[in-house]
Each structure stands twice: as C-alpha cells, then as structure tokens.
C-alpha cells in the first residue's frame, strides 16, 4: 500500500509517500519561517494562504522525486488536528479532494500521534509498550503507549508547553523566530549554572508547568537592566526545561516499570535534552529512541506512516471533511 501523507497543521507544508513494502519513497518539505520571521511568530492567515500556494507544486515535486505516479497512490492521510484551523483545512480539503478524484480512501491523522510514531520509521524502532515524551510548541505530555491507539496519559503541562516557553522567552530576549533553536544556539556559549531558575512542579507527580519559569526569566532580564548576559540566560533557562523533562521522564519509567522512552515533537531535536536523557537513562539501564533528524519537526512522512497504521486496520473517513484544532490524544480510538 502506498500512502500519501499531508502535513499542514502550522507553518510547514510537508508531503511524503510511505510504501508498506519499501518504506519511505520520498518526502518534500517547505518551511514558512522566512514568511513569519518579521512578525515574531506564526500569522494564521498567512500560513493557510501559503499552504494553498505550495501544495500542488510540492505534490508534483514529490511524484517526480519518488518515481511514483499519482494513479499508484492507494490512500491519502492528512493532518486533521490539532493545529491552526485554516492551515488544517487547506491540507484536509486538498487530501480529501485528491482521494475522491482517485477513488481511494482518505483518513485524518492526529498530528501528535504522527510525531509519536515517527521513531518507528527508524532502522531500529522501539517495541511496544513504551513511555512517550511528547514535547513541542503546543504539547508537553508523558504517555504509556501500549500499541496503536492505546495511549495512557501519565502527565501533561497545566499551562505553557515546553516549546511555547522557549518561543516566549526568545521573544523576551529579542531573538529571531523560531525561538527554540535560537535559544539552544545561544546557550552553547553560556553558563547553565549562571542563574538558578525554578523547576516548577518538579516533585509533584508527572504534570508539568512552565509559566512560572517564564516569569522568572522575565524578572531576571529586568534586574539586569540592559547588561548583556543573554548567553547565560539562555543556557540557564534551557537547563531548567531540560532538567524538568529528564527527571519527569525518569520518574515515569520507574513508575511504569518500562525501559523504553520515545521522545517526539520539535523540542526532541534539542541536543542538550538528548545528551541529558541518554546520560540519565543509562543509569537506570533504559533506552531512549528518537525519530530520524529530518522527522523530528513537522513533516508528511509521519502523517503517511500513522495514516497507514489506521488504514490497514480498516479505518477511513467519509466524504465529509473534518478538522479538529483542539484534539486530545486520549480521544483516539484503537483500530479494530
């Protein structure tokens, strides 16, 4: 089965072809970073308009790159949610229309399920069950993954997601968009122990809270009164986030008795986080798994793969086009 995956939940237009026999046949990705940079963040209307402009050219590029003919596509998977309504709708309409024209099934995929299953595309995928740390601009969650659609929520952020905190602190520091990678880059030349920022809720279950940390950074920046300590601020802030994510992940593994941790979402690309996770998990003889670097950020491959998992179980959508900007993963059903 060859599945076309479409990702348009935010500011990346990603398309990919997943072949159940040959694996990933090809993928293309267009990022809108330059478009939104002058605004310091994603402008939803501009994002959806740019998806409209890019979908057909990228589709043609993907078919040429992969050597697959449009008529060979067996099904279409598109991101149904969560995400920006207009951006989601462009991908959903494109995908559902294409599937209808080819007389093929289509299915809407949960964006974070795509991220969480992306490590299964690697050469050494994790086996079920495992603990998943989903960490992105919109999500910070710990879950036990028993199988496709079998997700048990252990804890989540009660306010800002980790990626959102990165972006907001970057804005406070007048760093360019996207904030997370720029903070990580600046942190390389800073001292992570220079400022003692809080680790909210560190010893309170498996939920997260990052709004207090964000406020602490704001207060410290005002105290500096123009003194340039940006590298130290970035390093200390990043260390607080990483320390919290690592310790909660270790706690989740101990609590569940599992020895496999999958980390997924845009923040999973953070090198300091990976370094600290590997060190901490080695101490408890546990293993950490990531998606391939190209599959850490938003992409069509993860949607194609997640869609395939549900399509092969017989799931597909009707003719109605549905998008769900707010969609808890705990609402997902088990394929039958």
From Swiss-Prot:
Positions bound to Fe cation: 111, 115, 298
Keywords: Acyltransferase, Cytoplasm, Iron, Metal-binding, Transferase, tRNA processing
GO biological process: tRNA threonylcarbamoyladenosine modification
Cofactor: Fe(2+)
E.C. number: 2.3.1.234
Top-level division of the source organism's lineage: Bacteria
EC class: transferase
Residues involved in substrate binding: 134-138, 167, 180, 270
GO CC terms in record: cytoplasm
Cofactor remark from the record: Binds 1 Fe(2+) ion per subunit.
InterPro entries for the chain: ATPase_NBD, Gcp-like_dom, KAE1/TsaD, Peptidase_M22_CS, TsaD
Reactions the enzyme catalyzes: L-threonylcarbamoyladenylate + adenosine(37) in tRNA = N(6)-L-threonylcarbamoyladenosine(37) in tRNA + AMP + H(+)
Alphabetized PROSITE patterns for the sequence: GLYCOPROTEASE
Molecular function terms from GO: iron ion binding; N(6)-L-threonylcarbamoyladenine synthase activity
UniProt key word Nuclease: no
This protein's record includes keyword Iron: yes
Annotated compartments: Cytoplasm
Role played: Required for the formation of a threonylcarbamoyl group on adenosine at position 37 (t(6)A37) in tRNAs that read codons beginning with adenine. Is involved in the transfer of the threonylcarbamoyl moiety of threonylcarbamoyl-AMP (TC-AMP) to the N6 group of A37, together with TsaE and TsaB. TsaD likely plays a direct catalytic role in this reaction.
Family: Belongs to the KAE1 / TsaD family.
Name of the protein in its database record: tRNA N6-adenosine threonylcarbamoyltransferase
Lineage summary: Bacteria, Pseudomonadati, Pseudomonadota, Gammaproteobacteria, Moraxellales
Gene: tsaD
């Amino acid at each position: 089965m060859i599945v076309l995956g479409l990702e348009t939940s935010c500011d990346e237009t990603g398309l990919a072809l997943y072949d159940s026999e040959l694996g990933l046949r090809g993928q293309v990705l267009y990022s809108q970073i330059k478009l939104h940079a002058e605004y310091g963040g994603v402008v939803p209307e501009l994002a959806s308009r740019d998806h409209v402009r890019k979908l057909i050219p990228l589709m043609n590029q993907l078919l040429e790159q992969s050597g697959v003919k449009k008529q060979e596509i067996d099904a279409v998977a598109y991101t149904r949610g969560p995400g920006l309504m207009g951006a989601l709708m462009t991908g959903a309409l494109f995908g559902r229309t294409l599937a209808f024209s080819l007389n093929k099934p289509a299915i809407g995929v949960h964006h974070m399920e795509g991220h969480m299953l992306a490590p299964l595309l690697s050469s050494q995928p994790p086996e079920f069950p495992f603990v998943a740390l989903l960490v992105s601009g919109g999500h910070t969650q710990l879950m036990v993954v028993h199988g496709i659609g079998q997700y048990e929520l252990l804890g989540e952020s009660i306010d800002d997601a980790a990626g959102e905190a990165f972006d907001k602190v970057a804005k406070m520091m007048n760093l360019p968009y996207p904030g997370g990678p720029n903070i990580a880059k600046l942190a390389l030349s800073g001292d992570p122990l220079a400022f003692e920022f809080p680790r909210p809720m560190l010893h309170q279950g498996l939920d997260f809270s990052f709004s207090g940390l964000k406020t602490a950074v704001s207060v410290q920046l005002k105290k500096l009164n123009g003194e340039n300590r940006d590298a130290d601020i970035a390093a200390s802030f990043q260390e607080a986030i990483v320390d919290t994510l690592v310790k909660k992940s270790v706690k989740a593994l101990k609590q569940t008795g599992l020895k496999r941790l999958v980390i997924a979402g845009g923040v999973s690309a953070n090198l300091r986080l990976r370094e600290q996770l590997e060190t901490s998990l080695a101490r408890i003889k546990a293993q950490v798994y990531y998606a391939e670097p190209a599959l850490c950020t938003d992409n069509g491959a993860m949607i194609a793969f997640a869609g395939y998992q549900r399509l092969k179980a017989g799931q597909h959508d009707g003719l109605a086009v549905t998008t769900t900007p707010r969609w808890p993963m705990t609402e997902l059903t088990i394929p039958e």
